[in-house]
Amino acid sequence: MSNFSEERATMIAAGDLQEFVPFGRDHCKHHPNALNLQLRQLQPASELWSSDGAAGLVGSLQEVTIHEKQKESWQLRKGVSEIGDAADYDEELYVAGNMVIWSKGSKSQALAVYKAFTVDSTVQQALWCDFIISQDKSEKIYKSHELEKCICILQSSCMNMHSIDGKDYIASLPFQVANVWATKYGLLFERCSSSHEVPPSLPREPLPTMFSMLHPLDEITPLVCKSGSLFGSSRVQYVVDPAVKIVFLNIDPSIVMTYDAVQNVHSVWTLRRVKPEEENAVLKFPEQAGTLQNATTSSSLTAHLRSLSKGESPVASPFQNYSSIHSQSRSTSSPSLHSRSPSISNMAALSRAHSPALGVHSFSGAQRFNLSSHSQSPKRHSISHSPSGSFNDSFLAPETEPIVPELCIDHLWTETLPNIREKNSQASKVFITTDLCGQKFLCFLVEAQLQLRCVKFQESNDKTQLIFGSVTNIHAKDAAPVEKIHTMLVLEGNGNLVLYTGVVRVGKVFIPGLPAPSLTMSNMMPRPSTPLDGVGTPKPLSKLLGSMDEVVLLSPVPELRDSSKLNDSLYNEDCTFQQLGTYIHSVRDPVHNRVTLELSNGSMVRITIPEVATSELVQTCLQAIKFILPKEVAIQVLVKWYNVHSAPGGPSCHSEWSLFVICLLNMMGYNTDRLAWTRSFDFEGSLSPVIAPKKARPSDTGSDEDWEYLLNSEYHRNVESHLLNKSLCLTALEVSNAKDEDFSQNLSLDSSTLLFAHIPAIFFVLHLVYEELKLNTLMGEGICSLIDLLVQLARDLKLDSYLDHYYRDSPTLVKTTGQVCTIDQGQMGFMHHPPFFTSEPPSIYQWVSSCLKGEGMPPYPYLPGICERSRLVVLSIALYTLGDESCVSDETCQYLSKVTSTPQKPQAEQEENRFTFRHSASVSVLAERLVVWMASVGFTLRDLETLPFGIALPIRDAIYHCREQPDSDWSEAVCLLIGRQDLSKQACEGNLPRGKSVLSSEVSSGTEAEEEDDGMNDLNHEVMSLIWSEDLRVQDVRRLLQSAQPVRVNVVQYPELSDHEFIEEKENRLLQLCQRTMALPVGRGMFTLFSYHPVPTEPLPVPKLNLTGRAPPRNTTVDLNSGNIDVPPNMASWASFHNGVAAGLKIAPASQIDSAWIVYNKPKHAELANEYAGFLMALGLNGHLTKLATLNIHDYLTKGHEMTSIGLLLGVSAAKLGTMDMSITRLLSIHVPALLPPTSTELDVPHNVQVAAVVGIGLVYQGTAHRHTAEVLLAEIGRPPGPEMEYCTDRESYSLAAGLALGMVCLGHGSNLIGMSDLNVPEQLYQYMVGGHRRFQTGMHREKHKSPSYQIKEGDTINVDVTCPGATLALAMIYLKTNNRSIADWLRAPDTMYLLDFVKPEFLLLRTLARCLILWDDILPNSKWVDSNVPQIIRENSISLSEIELPCSEDLNLETLSQAHVYIIAGACLSLGFRFAGSENLSAFSCLHKFAKDFMNYLSAPNASVTGPYNLETCLSVVLLSLAMVMAGSGNLKVLQLCRFLHMKTGGEMNYGFHLAHHMALGLLFLGGGRYSLSTSNSSIAALLCALYPHFPAHSTDNRYHLQALRHLYVLAAEPRLLVPVDVDTNTPCYALIEVTYKGTQWYEQTKEELMAPTLLPELHLLKQMKVKGPRYWELLIDLSKGEQHLRSILSKDGVLYVKLRAGQLSYKEDPMGWQSLLAQTVANRNSEARAFKPETISSFTSDPALLSFAEYFCKPTVSMGPKQEILDLFSSILYECVAQETPEMLPAYIAMDQALRSLKKRDMSDTSDLWQIKLILEFFSSRSHQDRQHTYPKRGLFINSEFLPVVKCTVDATLDQWLQAGGDVCVHAYLSGQPVEKSQLNMLACFLVYHSVPAPRHLPPMGLEGSTSFAELLYRFRHLKMPVRALLRLAPVLLGNPQPMVM
C-alpha cells in the first residue's frame, strides 16, 4: 500500500470528469430527415431483437448494423467566435449516414446545433476548411487574406461546400477520392488506387495520386513534388506513386506527412505554392525536357530508390518522374471532353479549353481517368487495358492547354530505415506538440509496435524552412496532444495514462472515478500485441477488416455478437465507470486542455487536464524563470512545479502563490520549514507531500513541531484575545522562542539543488517582473506577494541596494532586519552571475523620472514578451519627451536592453551621452507618431486606464494633442485610443462591404394604401427633412410625379353638348392628360434613383401606370378603352418601359442581387413584358446585370421581343462601360449588320434594336478609340437607304445613334486619334454636317450599298437632315474640352442671311452646343456670353416678340431670323448647363433662370407665332433642363416653381415630349432624393448628351429622331455627393458646419466656403480639402490632395460622416443660434463663478453616464456636510474642469492625487507609488519638452488645471517639511549614516527619500556625512549624485549639523 501512496504522490489529478456522448448522435434521432430505418441502424442490435419478432430479420439487420455502425464519426475543434479570437469551447462535426451535424458550444452553455446538412448519398468524410478569396495567388497573400470559412462534405462522386456566409458550392469529382485534407491553401485530395491496378500493355506514365483545389470554384489540379535527387540537384514531378499515402497534414506550419507502403518509411514534406519555374519544368513537353524518360526508366529509378541502404535517409523522393506526361493524346474512349474537371489519361487532357461548367456529374471516376477504380464499372477491363489504337499518335491538340499545378510538396525529412522493418508500420495517429519551453515535436503513433515516435523540429533562423532533429521513441498504445498546457497524454501499454511535455515524462494522470490500472487490470488487460478490435465505434471499419474487396467475410454477425455488450453500454445513458475491468482503451478529440477517453466498456468520458498555473502572478513568474533558464533546467523546474500544483487535492487559487514560493525556494536549496515567513503560509487543508519530497512521511501520531506550529499560528493569537479566554482567567501559554532564535542563527542553503546556481538570474528577472507589475494598477496584491520573496533573496545575496529600493517602494512591508540564510563564500562560487545582472536595481519610475529631467540613464532591461508594459512606457517616454522618432521603428533600441542568456557588452559603455531632447519633429508629429505606434502594438484605452496616473500622463497628453486634429485615414484602433468615436466608427464602416447603411429608410408599417404603390416611399425622409426643413417640397414633388392614381378630368358640360359628346369630350381630355402621365416615370426614376435595397426573397414592387381618370363631382371613372374615341395603338408601350426602368433604378448599386432574383422578377403576363424590359435596362445601369447568367441573356434575346432586346442590350453595355468586353461585343454585333461579315446571313433585326445595339457598341468601347469600331460607326452615320424598304424609316435615330456611338468611342481624343489619320474622321463628319457628294464606300460593306433604294431618291448626295445631328454631336464629343478653335469655327452659326437659309434652325442649337463644348474653358456663366454666340446679323435684326407691328423687309426672312435666334440662345444655355452641371453655380443659375423666364414670356407674346410655339416650347424645355442640370439634386425652389407651372399646362400644344422634358427637369432637380448630383467628366457629358438630346418625341411611340430608351443614360452621369453628418452617440443624422477648400484655377484663387451639412459637395476634383468645423463638433479634416478615395467611399455609402458633439455644446437642432451653449463657455473661460455652478447643470454639457453619476453621488450637497463640504467643492470644480476642458479621463487622476495628498497629511502612506506619480506629473510639467510645447501651442495640451498643480506641490513640500522639523531630521541622519530608524517613522522617511530623490547611503561621498562646513562645499561634493538643489537645502541642516533647516 505504501508503494501506492508514493505513486499517488506524483500523480496529476485530472479534473471535471464528464460522460461524453457526441452531440450529433443525439440530434440525429430527432432530426426530421432521420427516417425510421436510419434510426434503427443507429440502435444497438439488442434493442432491435426485443422489438422485432423474426430472428431472420435480426440477422439481416445486424449485418446492416455492422456496416452502418462504423459510418458514425465525429471530430472536435477549438471554438472560434465570430470576431475571430479563439474562445474556450468545443465545436463538433458529426457524420452519420448522409447527415452532417455541426454543433457549437459557447462560454456559457452546452453544445447547440449550428448547422445540419443532409446530402443525397452517404457522407464519406466531412471537414472544416478555410478557403482564401483572392485574385492574386502569391504566397504573401496568405498573411493578410480574406477567408471564406466552409464545411466540406465528401460524397462518392462530388464534394459539397457550404460557407458560413450562406454560399453553397458543389464540385464534381473526376475520380474516386480516398481521403481529403484541409490545408492552408484549400483542399488536398488523394485518389483511390486499387491495389490490383494492372499496368497497361503500352508503357505509359502512371497517373497522379494527389490533387489540390484552392477554392470551390477552381479546378482540381495535380500536386507536384520536389525532392533532392541522388546527384544533389532537385527534380520536380507529379506525385504518382500509389504506395505513398498521406497520414497527416498540418496547416501551420504547412507540412504533410506521407507513408510509403513499399519502403515502410514516413516522410515529411512542406506544402507550398508552386513557383513559376517549377510549373514550367512540369509542363514541358518531352522534346524540350532535356532528358526524355519513359515509364520504364522512371520506374527503375523508383526501384533504385527503394533499395537504398538502410542507414541513410533517402533524400530523393519516392515518387516517379512524370515529365513525359504530355506525350500521349486523349484516349478516344474518354467522354470527358465537355467536363469542367479534367480527365487525366495524360496532362494534355487536363485542359481548360473544353471546360464549360456543365455536364459534371455524368462520368464515373473510372471513365474520367482511364483507370480501374472502386466503382465496379463494366468497362473496367477494357479501360485498364486499352488497345493501343485508343492512344493514337496525334500529339497535343492545339487548343488544349494543360492544367497548371497550384501546390507543391517539398521534401524535408524521411525517417531512417531500421534493420528489420515491419510490414504494417503506418502511423495511425500523427500530431504536433510543443513542450513547456516551446520546442516542437512531430509525434506519430505506430500502433503495431506500440511506439510513439517523436521528432524534434525547429524553424531555421531565417524562418524559411524547418529543420528536423533526432527521433525519440516512447512506449505507447495511444496518445493525444494537450495544446493549452504544452503537453501530451500518452496511454501506456499497461493502461496507465501518463503526461509528457515533449519527450520528458511529467507524471501519471489520476482520474477520480476510474480505478488505477495497477489495481484492477491485472488480468483483464489484453497483451500489447493483441489489437483491440471490436471496441469503440468510431474506429474506421477498414482498419479492422482491411479492404472489403479482398477479405471475404464468412459471417460478420458472430463477430459482432461478441461486441454487442459494448454497443449496449455505448448507448446506455447511465453507465458507471466502476464496473470491474473497465480500462482506458484510447484517447481522442483533444481540444484546449480537454480530452476524451474511450473506455473498454465502450463508454466515453471527457476529462480536463489542469493548467500550469491559474493566477496571473504565478504565470508571469514562471514565464520569466522559463525565459532565463537553460531549456533543460527550465523543463525540470516546470515539471516539478506542475506535479506539485496538480497533485490530487491541489491548492486553491488563493494559496497557489504560497505553493509556488515554497516550491521555488525548495528548488533553490532553502529549507522552507525553517524559514519563518514561508512557515506561516496558511494552506487550506494539508499540503501535498510532494512539496518536500525528501522528507519521510510524517507519522500519523503527530509530533512536538505540530504543537509549536499551532502556538505560533494566527489562530492561536485569535483564541488568546478571545473574550471567553479572559473571562475564564486562563493564563497565556508560553510560546517557545527557542525556535525563532534557532531560525535566525544557522540557516544555510543546500547548494546541490537544481536552481542554486541560478538564484541571481532568477532574482533579477523576478525583480523585472516586479517593476512590470508596478505599471499595472490592478496588480497591487501581486506586488505585495512578490516583494516578500524578493526581499528574502536580496538579503541572502547581500544586495543592499535592492533592499533599499524595496524599502522605498513599500516601507510597511519591508522590515529593515529579518531572517538571513547565509551563503558562504565557497557556495557563492557555484552561483552563476549573469552578465545582465546590475548592482543598481533597475527602477522604471526612476528611469522615467531621469528621462523627464533629461539626465543620463542606462538602457532599461526588459524581458521580451513578459515585460511588455515596461517596454511600452520606456519607448513612449523616449519618443514623446525626448523626441526620438527612431526609437519605435528600430529593432535595436538604445533605451532598452533585452535580457538574454547570451553575454552582452558591459553596461558601462552604453551610459554616455544619453537623453538629449531633439527638436527634430513638431509636437503634433511626435504625438501622432506615438499614438499610431501604440495602437499598432495593440495598446488600448483599457490598458491606459490601468497604467499609474503619472506614467500615463505623457501618453494622455499626446492623445489630447491628436484628438483636436486627427488624420481622417487613421485606423479604427487609433481613433478609439484618442477617444474619437466618430472616426473609429467611420473607419469601422469603411472596412465593411457596401450594403444597407445607417440611413437606409425604414418605411413605417402604417403607411396609407395610396402611398404604398406610388414607387416613392423608399426615400430617406429623415435626411430629406434635414435638407429641406422649411417646407413640404418633397411631398409636392411626389404628388407631381406619381402615376399610380387616376387623374382628375375636369370638363364643363355646356348646354349644347349632348351626353355622348360630353363623354367623348372627357375622353379626349383624358387622352391629353395621359400624354403627361406617360411622361412621369422617367422623372420618377430620377427622383428615386438608388434609394432601395430589395429583399432577395421578394419581387421588386413596380407601381402601376394608371391611365384612367376620375371626373368630378361624382368621381366617375373615365377610361380610354370604351371605344368612343380613337386611341393610338401601343400608346402606353414605351410608358410601361419607362415605368419598368424607374422601378429598377430604385435598386441601390450595393444591393445583394443575383441572377436568380432577376429571373424571379420576370412577369407572368405578356402585357408586363415592356415593364420587365425596362427593369432589365435599369439593372444594367446600376451595375447588376453583369450577374445575369449568359444563358438567361440568350434566352431573353431569342424571344424576339423588341423592347426586351433594347433594354437588355443597352443594360449590358452600360454595365460594361468602356471595358471592350468581347462577349458583349459579340452579343451586340449580331444586332448591327455593319459589324457582321458581308457573307453572313441577313438577320431580321428590328430598327430600334439596331439603334440600341449601335449605342451599346459606343458604351462598351467608350474612350478606347478602337479603330475598327470607329470606322464602322463613321460609315453608319451616312448609311444610305437600301432596296426593299431596308433602312428607310426612322433613319434619323440610327444616324444619330451612330454619331453618338462614334463620339463615345473617340471621346475627348481630339486630334490624337492614333492610327486613324487615313479615316479623316473630322473631315468626313464635317461633310455629313454640311452636305455634299457621298464618298465611295470602302471596305467590306461596299457590296451592300451598290443597289439603291427604290423608295427614297437621294442620289449620291448626302441627306443632311439625316446625318447632321449625329455628325455634329460626334464632333462635339471627339473634341470635347480640347479648346480646338479650328474645329469650333466649323460649327459657328452662319453670319449671312443666304447661308442661314441652308441650315435648319434646330440644327443651329446642336452646332452652338457642340462649339461651346469644344471651347469648354471659354464658357462663362453670364447672359453676355450667351448672347455672344448669336451672329451679328441676327443680333442686329432680331425683333422683339412683344411688339404689335412687325417690321417689313424684303431681304430678311424674319421667321428664319427669330427661329435661329431662339435656337442659338437655347444651344448656348444647354452648353452652360453641361459646363456647370451639378455645381449649383449661382451666376449660371441666375443667367439661365432669366432666359427661362424670357422664353415663358415669349410664349404669351403677341408675335409668338412668328417664331412658332413649337420652337419656343422646345427652347423653353431645353433651358429648363439646363437649369435643372446646374441645380441637380439641390431641390431649388425657383426651378421647382417653373416645373410645377409647366406641369399644370396640359393644353393641345403640350405634347408628350415637352412633358417628358419638364418632368426630367423636375427629376434632375431632386436627383436620388437629393443624394445625387451630376458629374462633368467626359463620360458623364457623353451620357447626358444621349439622355437630354434636345429633340423631344412628338408622341409616346415616337422614336424617329431619338430612341426614347436613351433618355435613361443620365444614370451614368449621376454620382453620390450628399454628405450627411451622423451624430455618433445618438446615431441620427444632424446638422454640422463644414468648410470646403477649392483648389485654385485659372478663374479663381484657392478659396474656402462654409456649408451647412447635410449638403451636396462640389465635384471632388475641384476640392483641396474638406473639414468639419468646430466649435460644436470635434474637428475632422479630410485632405483630398492625398487622394479622393476616402471621401468617395464615404459618399458611396450614403454619405454618412460620423461627427461627435463636443462637451458643453448642443446640436444645431436643439440650439440653432448657439446661445444655450454659453453656459459652458463661462466654465471653459475659468470664471470665478465656476465653483458656484450646480452639479445638476452638468447634463447640459455632457451625456457621459459615468460623469453624470459622479455628479449625482459625489458632488451633490446633503444637509449636514461639515468638513466634507470642502471635498465636495473640490470634486465639483474638478468635474467642471474635466468636462469643460473635454478631458473627462483625467477625473480619476485628479481624485487619486487628492487622495494621495490626504493620506500623506495623515502620515499613513503604506507605499510610495502615488507619491511617485505626483512627482512624475510635476516633473513632466516642468520638463523641457513640455515647456517647449506650451510655448508653441499655448491653447493645446494643458491637461491639468494650472491652479491645481502648484497647490499639490506646495502641500507635499509643506507636509514633508513639517515632518522634517518634527523629528524627521534625526531619522534622515540615522538612515544616511546606516543606523536603525525608529519603526513609526519608516513610512514618512521613505516618502521623504522618494520625493526628494535622496541617494542611498552607499552613494554618499566617501568622507562620510561630516566634514562639510558650508552649503557651497556640500553642493560641490554632491554634484555627481544628480540631487535637486531643493532636496540638498533640506538635507543641509542634517549633513552640516546645523539645527536651522534651510527650507525655501
UniProtKB/Swiss-Prot annotation:
Give the source species: Mus musculus
Q: Would you tell me the protein name for this molecule?
A: Anaphase-promoting complex subunit 1
Cellular component aspect of the GO annotation: anaphase-promoting complex; nucleus
| Post-translational modification comment from the UniProt entry | Phosphorylated. Phosphorylation on Ser-355 occurs specifically during mitosis.
Phosphothreonine modification sites are: 291, 537
Disordered, as annotated region: 312-343, 370-395, 991-1014
Lineage from the top down?
A: Eukaryota, Metazoa, Chordata, Craniata, Vertebrata
Q: Which residues carry this modification: Phosphotyrosine?
A: 571
Function, please?
Component of the anaphase promoting complex/cyclosome (APC/C), a cell cycle-regulated E3 ubiquitin ligase that controls progression through mitosis and the G1 phase of the cell cycle. The APC/C complex acts by mediating ubiquitination and subsequent degradation of target proteins: it mainly mediates the formation of 'Lys-11'-linked polyubiquitin chains and, to a lower extent, the formation of 'Lys-48'- and 'Lys-63'-linked polyubiquitin chains. The APC/C complex catalyzes assembly of branched 'Lys-11'-/'Lys-48'-linked branched ubiquitin chains on target proteins.
Member of which family? Belongs to the APC1 family.
